[in-house]
Regions:
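Predominant activation on well-ordered alpha-helical scaffold segments within soluble catalytic domains
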Residues: 117-124, 173-177, 221
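Oxyanion-binding "anion nests"
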Residues: 169-200, 204-206
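N-terminal Rossmann-like NAD(P) cofactor-binding subdomain of oxidoreductases
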Residues: 1-167, 185
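Generic secondary-structure signature for well-ordered alpha-helical cores
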Residues: 125-129, 170, 178-185, 212-213, ...
């Protein structure tokens, strides 16, 4: 409290940013948009106290799931503001750009779901794949697990090692299933296994799909290339090109 943000992140020391203060002392009249990047369960507390004219953009899981019972099931936390769930929107910008105006709460997707839904949502909408048999092998750097990762692993156990974790029970399964089911309008089956690999950051998701009819790999590639051509942050590699993080 009272220090500049640059004290913790030297990379932004030249930026003019306010000093860190307690949320109780914030003058809400000077704020239009509020970002929260806090542990699960904290953003919903803030959502209850901020004025309704402030847009909350949350990076946690507090408003990702439409059903508070599912949130309790997957995250083990009773939701403190169930009514605000209905006023929130789960938003991957590439798919919900036109729905973001006049929103109260924008919920950002998880890291794995982002990498998985960017290619899958267009294909599910176009009915190009069998949604009852989607296999996802995803690998992530250890920074995605936050500070707690260092309590479970030391450098020696991370180095030259690949570990599968939360097999069949990863929390991100809930939002992947929720969003793909909305689009397909029927029950889907996703087999998702995340892995921790010895690098600091980055995600590589390899997705195995069963296509319908004459939808070859080349046809799917061409469709995704066309679909994302105006999405600035999506870069489509050349067909059959080796890719990595």
């Amino acid at each position: 409290i009272g220090k500049n943000i640059s004290f913790f992140d030297k990379g932004i020391k030249k930026k003019f940013l306010p000093k860190i203060s307690k949320i109780k002392k914030i003058n809400w009249n000077k704020i239009n948009v509020l970002f929260t990047a806090l542990p699960n369960g904290e953003a919903q507390k803030i959502a209850k106290i901020i004025p309704p004219y402030i847009l909350l953009i949350d990076l946690s899981a507090d408003f990702r799931l439409n059903d508070h019972k599912l949130y309790k099931k997957w995250y083990g936390i009773n939701h403190k503001c169930k009514k605000l769930i209905k006023k929130s929107i789960y938003a991957i910008t590439e798919f919900s750009r036109n729905k973001l105006n006049n929103q109260n709460i924008i919920s950002c997707p998880g890291c794995y779901p982002t990498s998985i839904q960017l290619p899958l949502i267009p294909l599910v909408r176009k009915k190009m794949i069998n949604t009852s048999n989607i296999v996802i092998d995803a690998k992530s750097g250890y920074s995605g697990a936050g500070k707690n990762i260092h309590k479970k692993f030391n450098f020696k156990s991370l180095f030259n090692s690949v570990s599968a974790y939360n097999v069949g029970s990863h929390r991100h399964m809930a939002e992947i299933d929720q969003e793909l089911t909305k689009i397909s309008k029927k029950k889907i089956n996703v087999f998702f296994t995340p892995h921790l690999i010895p690098m600091f950051r980055g995600i590589l998701s390899t997705i195995y799909l069963e296509t319908y009819g004459k939808n070859s790999a080349k046809k799917i590639y061409n469709y995704l290339k066309k679909y994302h051509k105006n999405n600035f942050f999506i870069k489509i590699a050349k067909f059959n090109t080796s890719i990595g993080t």
